[in-house]
Amino acid sequence: MGIVMLTFNEYTTISNNCSDNKQLSDAINSVCSAALEESSVISHEIKNQAAYLKTCYQLLSSRNDELRSNKFWNNMGSTIDELVNYLERTSIYRYSFKQSETVSCTLSDIINNINEYIKSRYNGLIALDTSDISLECSSASIYASSHFLNIALKEIIDNAYEAASERNCNKCILILSAIMSPDIKDQLILSIGSKKTNNGSSIYQPDNISSCINNDINDNNCNRPGLKSKLCKPFYTTHKGHTGLGLSIVNQICLLSGIGWNIVSDNDVVTTVFTFNLQS
C-alpha cells in the first residue's frame, strides 16, 4: 500500500466537495477507514517482527564476546536499530492522520512540554533559550490540539538537533521566539531554530519573524529550492540523516489542526515558524 500525501489545495478541494455531497463524504470515509485498519494491522505485525529480531540480536550479543567485537555484527545491530526506529516513526505518521480534540492551552504549557522532552531525550545536549518570549505571549491561550502539537514540536526539535550536530556543535542551542501577529488579530507567531554558535546567531528574531513568513519561504529567495513543494512529500526532512518521515508528520498535524507553518532558511540555519489562532 502506497503512502499518499495531499497538498493543502487538494485537501481543501476534497473537504469542500465532501461538505456539499454526503455520498462522496461517506464513500471517502469508508475507504479511509478500511485502508487505515489494514495498514494498522500490517504495521503492527512488522513492528512485532522487528522487535523480536532486535531482542534476539541483543541476546546473542550478550552471550558472545566475539560477536560484540565483530564489525559486521555491530553494523547489523545498527541497521536493526534504524529499522525499529523507522517503523516507530511510520506509526506516528499514520497516527497523525487521526482527528484530535482541539482544546485551549498556553504557550507556557508548550514550553514546559518541550523542556521535559529535551531533558528526557538529550540529557544536556540541548539548551533552550526562551528569553525573547514576553509574558503576554507566554500566557496567551492557543486553540489547538496540544497532544498532536507536542508530537509536531518533537519532530522539529529532533531536526534542529541533527542539523546542529552536522555543523559539529558541541551543544545545540534552540531559540524560541514569539510575537503577536502585527497583521492578523488574535494570532500568535512562534519560531523555533538552532543557533549557529560559530558565527553568532543566525536565527530569526521577533522583529523580523513577520516579514520572513511572507518572503523567505518563497522558492525564489530561499536557500533550499523547491522546499515548499517538498513539504508535501513523505520522507522529506531538512537533514539527510533523519530517520523516518520527519517534516511530513509536522505538515499533516498542522493541516488537520488548523495551524499555519513555514520553514525559512538563512546561512544554512533552518527556522520553523508556526502561527496559532488565539482563543477569543
Predicted regions and their residues:
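Glycine-rich ATP-binding loops of the HATPase_c
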Residues: 258-266
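Detector for a conserved hydrophobic position within an alpha-helical segment of the HATPase_c
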Residues: 254-255
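Short alpha-helical Gxxx[C/S/T] motif in the catalytic ATP-binding
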Residues: 246, 250
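Conserved micro-motifs of the catalytic ATP-binding
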Residues: 95-100, 137, 141-144, 238, ...
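Histidine phosphotransfer helical core of two-component systems
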Residues: 11-27, 31-38, 42, 46-85
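Glycine-rich/acidic phosphate-handling loop/turn and adjacent ATP-lid/helix
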Residues: 186-239
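Conserved signal-transmission helix
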Residues: 1-34, 202, 211-226
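Conserved DHp (HisKA) dimerization/phosphotransfer helix of two-component histidine kinases, i.e.
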Residues: 49-56, 69-125
